[in-house]
């Protein structure tokens, strides 16, 4: 079986594994208070062009989302996001479990707009009973979205402007950040993205690390006591240097971006191959996730040979599935899949 099911099926990039082995018997303080984590934080700041940012290392995406969101919000507030947002549909109520409601808005190809933020906040504050309603306290988006789509620089600028107008911190979930930034459809640099939000994270788990996400806080108002929030949510890894080693390696010599670009290039080959066979694609993803709309017979053509993700029913006779590439996708596996698509 060849896996195109997700972007976390393999372990980690060989350079990371080598560094973990090299530093295995090094003795360091715990809880990310070691020299390696200090160097990794400095490397992240340099890459992001954020010399004054606070950088924290957490283990996984849901943990990062829950920690950041609950740290930002007051008890009576909720997080605005798309109705397809990860915190709304794929985190098993993790945000709600902290006492905060996820306030969803209709998505457009996975994204939300500045106008939706304006409308939601206007409606809330114009309601005479607004004190009886969960107050919007922040905005959550992901880059790329759950649909593999991207916000343009203009869209993100407009969203951040709206957030500033309504005094809402903007949090960008970057679980697949590298794949988004390396898409040919992306008109943003990581420096620009960092300047257009209050907090974001650089995903490692899906982008070459064994595990780990690097939370970057640029808004001074959100920095205070964040490590308390990490500990409270079970995210303070005793052997924190394992996270530092990984992110220091990913940030060196552009490794993070190089391995993500290869995954995107492969994914676009998959998209092109399906389109050449007349297969309709669901959405306009130009990142490492591709969503062909297949008949049951076409799905069976791949079953037993390729693992893919079932995404949902499209109509009475067609289904949306996801083929996902990663930093570790091999050329021979790509060749096999492209051949299978051609023979479909």
Locate the predicted segments by residue.
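Conserved PLP-anchoring active-site segment centered on the Schiff-base-forming lysine
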Residues: 71-89, 118
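Catalytic PLP-binding core of fold-type I/II PLP enzymes
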Residues: 151-183
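Conserved C-terminal alpha-helix-loop-beta "cap" of PLP-dependent enzymes
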Residues: 74-76, 268-342
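General beta-strand structural signal in soluble alpha/beta enzymes
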Residues: 3-6, 55-59, 81-82, 141, ...
